[in-house]
Amino acid sequence: MNRKAEETAARHGMFPAGCQVVAGVSGGGDSMAMLHLLLHPTFSLPVTVCHVNHMLRGKESDRDEAFVAKLCKAWGVPCKILRCDVAALARKKKIGVEECARLVRYDFFEQTAAKLAEASGAPVRIAVAHTLSDRVETMLFHLARGTSAKGLCSIPAARGEIVRPLIDCSRREVEGYCARHNIPHVTDSTNRSVAYTRNRIRLRVVPELRLVNAGAEENARRLMEDIREDDEYLSALAEEALLRARRGQAYGAGELDALPVPVKKRAAAMILDRWNAEKSAAQIDRFCKIIGEKSGTLNLSGGRRAQVKRGICSLWEPPEPYFEIPLTDGEHPLPGGGRVVVQTFDKKSYPAFQKIHKNEFHYRMDCDLSLIHI
């Protein structure tokens, strides 16, 4: 496993010279193996551990926090701990608990990394302990739910500052590493529950695949890499095509429609993404359809529309809503800034006032103040 992790890190340039590492450590076997490996002579990197107590499993969550803190003290590793009532935060934000927990974790990791980088001036990487098994399970989850080629690529080895040195190592290899090196770890009791979709895949689907072929995970890894390489190439072609088809803030529909279907769909997804619109497979197909028909509209969120007219594909947005200002004397603020000053005169006094202040008056109106608004 040491060799695999070292080759993975080198292939993806995970740890540049002089870098520091923020390691996300839950206390489970995967993250403990990663921490041990980062401190091992293979890497021998300066590491700061980050642990998040999500407060979701009562005493078990507190046990994990205490375990990580105690072990880091014994190993002489700096440790940062965050306690967060994720369930309450998820209700407040109106998002799922799992998604909320992920956002809290990565925000904590990134804040810690930013502080370390500012203090040291050295590059900082955030290491998380996803394994090949996690990657395969995620691919199967995406496949069952419905996804694109990008979704089948599953979890990337590296993205920005986030790196995954164990991404080519199976969970069995990690368990063997922990056993050989007597690495202590804790077990999350919820991992054994098939009430969670990912656990059903892990506990039921993947073992069946191994019965078909013991090398199923490695075969899946090769397939995911092939898909990733193809997707990156086709996405690059789509980016180039969009540059050629660009017409100011719009695009030439004919040029987009002439693209090969895999490139056209990726270009459509990129346009929808730039317009902050839904980019589901069905929406991408609808977008490609109006491009092919040379005219038509596609409803987007917020009352907006993608429209093709006279060979140009553009985004139509509803005009700013009208606003009213009551014609009462005084100063009235305008939406977006500015002001209007209203002053009324009777017919007799206005001509005399205009002579004195003629440079200040450009428009006037005769109106019934009880009916007219501007």
Where are these regions (language model features)?
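AMP-forming adenylation/ATP pyrophosphatase catalytic core
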Residues: 2-29, 48-54, 84-86, 104, ...
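Alpha-helix boundary/capping and short turn/kink residues
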Residues: 145, 149, 171, 210-214, ...
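Short, well-ordered coil loops that connect the C-terminus of an alpha-helix to the N-terminus
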Residues: 44, 77, 215, 274-277
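Electropositive, surface-exposed helix/loop patches at the edges of structured domains
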Residues: 116-129, 219-235
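Generic structural signal for hydrophobic core residues of well-folded globular domains
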Residues: 143-144, 166, 209, 227, ...
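Core alpha/beta nucleotide-donor-binding catalytic domains of modification enzymes
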Residues: 1-207
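Mid-to-C-terminal catalytic subdomains of enzymes
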Residues: 181-218, 222-225, 356-371
